[in-house]
Amino acid sequence: MKKFLIAPSILSADFARLGEDTANVLAAGGDVVHFDVMDNHYVPNLTIGPMVCEALRNYGITAPIDVHLMVKPVDRIVPDFAKAGASYISFHPEASEHVDRTIQLIKEHGCKAGLVFNPATPLSYLDYVMDKIDVILLMSVNPGFGGQSFIHGTLDKLRQVRKLIDDSGRDIRLEVDGGVKVDNIAEIAAAGADMFVAGSAIFGQPDYRK
């Protein structure tokens, strides 16, 4: 079994001191910095872009940066995030006109590529790209806003994807995002996830280590 990775979502951080807050959460045990990138088009919210990614790199953040694109179109912004220092770039297949080409674009720019599945998105998008992706991210809430409750049906979907990954024999991370808390993370891990995005559950605590 792979090492579990915790990916604090900076959407819940204090943006007035983002560099310091990000460094503190990594020092407390975070493994990966998670970016929720929203365009007020694919999802009804507007958040951050490549400039913030570059600023964190310039601040001295060396941990992997995991960019979750909730934007449409996807391809236009991929090179910008790669240049800004992204490590992983994941996108929603519904937001790309050509899923395979977008995966290739991400890889050509030196990043690991991921596909993101909303709660009601079928897994059939994986049928022809399992040999090309590095991350599968399952949304356990509907995308657009932080602080939502975990959708319990995601556990069955996690089990399905875990089997697909194991059967493929490939080194693919299984990430989950939405409503991950101290009281449900063990159950989520048991269903097959090995990378956990958490925002308010981490940044909302006085001591990030907890």
Curated annotation (Swiss-Prot):
Pathway: Carbohydrate degradation. Its cofactor is a divalent metal cation. Keywords: Carbohydrate metabolism, Isomerase, Metal-binding. It comes from Serratia marcescens. SUPFAM superfamilies: Ribulose-phoshate binding barrel. A divalent metal cation binds at H34, D36, H68, D177. GO terms for biological process: pentose catabolic process; pentose-phosphate shunt. It is an enzyme of class 5 (isomerase). This is Ribulose-phosphate 3-epimerase. Binds 1 divalent metal cation per subunit. Gene3D superfamilies: Aldolase class I. Its EC number is 5.1.3.1. Substrate binds at S9, H68, G144, F145, G146, G147, D177, G178, G179, G199, S200. HAMAP family: RPE (MF_02227). Catalyzes the reversible epimerization of D-ribulose 5-phosphate to D-xylulose 5-phosphate. One of its GO terms (molecular function) is metal ion binding. Pfam families: Ribul_P_3_epim. The active site is at D36 (proton acceptor), D177 (proton donor). It catalyses: D-ribulose 5-phosphate = D-xylulose 5-phosphate. Belongs to the ribulose-phosphate 3-epimerase family. CDD domains: RPE. Coiled coil: none annotated.
